[in-house]
Amino acid sequence: MARERRDSKAATFFCLAWALCLALPGYPQHVSGREDRADWTQEKYSHRPTILNATCILQVTSQTNVSRMWQNDLHPILIERYPGSPGSYAVRQHIKHRLQGLQAGWLVEEDTFQSHTPYGYRTFSNIISTLNPLAKRHLVIACHYDSKYFPPQLDGKVFVGATDSAVPCAMMLELARSLDRPLSFLKQSSLPPKADLSLKLIFFDGEEAFVRWSPSDSLYGSRSLAQKMASTPHPPGARNTYQIRGIDLFVLLDLIGARNPVFPVYFLNTARWFGRLEAIERNLNDLGLLNNYSSERQYFRSNLRRHPVEDDHIPFLRRGVPILHLIPSPFPRVWHTMEDNEENLDKPTIDNLSKILQVFVLEYLNLG
């Protein structure tokens, strides 16, 4: 961002309920194209979600638990974690451990590299977690896990970046945990279109500037990974297509966790996907699934347009990747201050946004 500026019985019930969701009629299902269909890299532009019915929505949202997320994922991330710090290593190990322990069988990789910074060469490590590496197309959900570097303070305080971006990291881990069974179902599917489309979670290092935001002092992790993906053949063995062409939609989360956020539209070419978030928010409210919520303060507002903000999506945008940027406008009042901490987070808002995001992901992956 341009920033100076439960048990086995319960498990069986869930599986049966999910099978019922998949069997229920009355909702449009994704129809696979001809076997000789055109270039697969173009399918993202005509992709249609499978709209979840009320039964499925109720089942999905019953699996998420914001208090468990708070304890198991948010607290371990709410530490100083600028690139190269002990906290950065600890958070990176936590993210990998949580993802590797899931039944879906994620491929979790570290993308480690060195880059020149105002403080000399530093080592950075992105975390890329892929549900099915053999799938041609991937929905990408991303955030950054580093915190902005602040010199030692006289009062001993450290910057933990609660909204920036500990909460998005925790939300992504909770998404993977709470959707573990449907995502396992997706991975085991061998028939198109499900076998052709999967999910990728990316946790970027080095989003923040060390000194002053500039093209060379910012977005270290995303710049490196975008370049790498643009030159890595995909699917394996391909000669003319690369990993970056396999990104269907790049959903970037940032500055999330404060009360009453407003998310505007930043990119018109992905406005239809923003519209799905808006519709899901409305549906969840109608079902009574949003806490401490007023429709007068809705989160996603398709009638609001804002100029793009520099963030980890930029290196991908420049390579033609469709972007859905979920960053509030205005920024939280605690942005880049020591007050961006746990005390200033709003748990109901985070819970609500987690539910919306999880439904969105299932719809996009045609798991409904």
Curated annotation (Swiss-Prot):
Domain of life: Eukaryota
Any one GO biological process: peptidyl-pyroglutamic acid biosynthetic process, using glutaminyl-peptide cyclotransferase
Protein's name in the database: Glutaminyl-peptide cyclotransferase
Residues holding Zn(2+): 164, 208, 336
Residues carrying sugar: 53, 65, 292, 352
Pfam families per the UniProt record, alphabetical: Peptidase_M28
Keyword Protein transport assigned: no
Provenance organism: Bothrops jararaca
Disulfide-bond pairs as recorded: 143-169
Cytoplasm listed as a keyword: no
InterPro entries tied to this protein: M28_QC (IPR037457), Peptidase_M28 (IPR007484), QC/QCL (IPR040234)
EC number: 2.3.2.5
Gene3D superfamilies tied to this protein: Zn peptidases
Record's keyword terms, sorted: Acyltransferase, Disulfide bond, Glycoprotein, Metal-binding, Secreted, Signal, Transferase, Zinc
GO molecular function, one term: glutaminyl-peptide cyclotransferase activity
Tissue: Expressed by the venom gland.
GO (cellular component) term, any one: extracellular region
Active-site residues from the entry: 207 (proton acceptor), 254 (proton acceptor)
Catalytic activity entry: N-terminal L-glutaminyl-[peptide] = N-terminal 5-oxo-L-prolyl-[peptide] + NH4(+)
Signal sequence, start to end: 1-23
Subcellular location: Secreted
Family: Belongs to the glutaminyl-peptide cyclotransferase family.
Function: Responsible for the biosynthesis of pyroglutamyl peptides. Has a bias against acidic and tryptophan residues adjacent to the N-terminal glutaminyl residue and a lack of importance of chain length after the second residue. Also catalyzes N-terminal pyroglutamate formation.
